């Protein structure tokens, strides 16, 4: 069994914010494959899908971003899921809007939702699907940026990023994180 966790904030007022790209991807995965009804469990919205014969829980913590681990840690322990089987999808300001980067582990990179997961899971060794939201405008704070909706002109890139991430998550669930990174991470151009 695996957990696929999308990070975000609960509530209508946050639905379309950049910080909620993880929730958007989870919803898009659920829209693309058959799933069980959503239910409330361990302070999260949870449903399950089957990928390649394996049960996969789709998870949207309802604890607010900075406390996401308070939901994910207990779910992981209840279902006896190894950290390497907890796939986390979240926003990344260091990537251009809609771009995807998959990593097998790593530090929080200053992301408070990931800090919370690391704290409650007890390790940095869980796969990440980082979805780009771009950098804030010069006059904006980081908080203003992540809690604002995507601009109208970036919607095409956002939708492509969500679609690409859905494909990458489902594909990686089938082939594993190493092959998934090779298959779905952007290819590096050769140095000249």
Residue ranges: model-predicted function:
Residues 108:
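Conserved TIR/SEFIR loop-to-helix hotspot centered on a Trp-containing motif
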């Amino acid at each position: 069994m695996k957990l696929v966790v999308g990070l975000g904030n609960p509530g209508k007022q946050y639905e379309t914010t950049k910080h909620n790209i993880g929730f958007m991807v989870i919803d898009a995965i659920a829209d693309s494959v058959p799933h069980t009804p959503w239910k409330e469990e361990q302070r999260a919205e949870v449903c399950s899908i089957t990928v390649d014969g394996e049960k996969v829980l789709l998870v949207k913590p309802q604890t607010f971003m900075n406390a996401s681990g308070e939901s994910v840690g207990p779910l992981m322990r209840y279902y006896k899921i190894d950290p390497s089987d907890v796939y986390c999808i979240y926003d990344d300001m260091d990537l251009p809007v809609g771009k995807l980067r998959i990593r097998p582990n790593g530090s929080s990179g200053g992301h408070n939702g990931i800090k919370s997961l690391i704290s409650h899971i007890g390790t940095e060794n869980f796969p990440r699907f980082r979805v780009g939201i771009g950098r804030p405008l010069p006059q904006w704070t980081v908080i203003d940026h992540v809690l604002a909706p995507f601009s109208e002109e970036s919607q095409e890139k956002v939708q492509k990023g969500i679609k690409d991430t859905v494909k990458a998550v489902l594909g990686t669930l089938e082939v594993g994180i190493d092959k998934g990174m090779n298959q779905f991470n952007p290819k590096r151009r050769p140095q000249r």
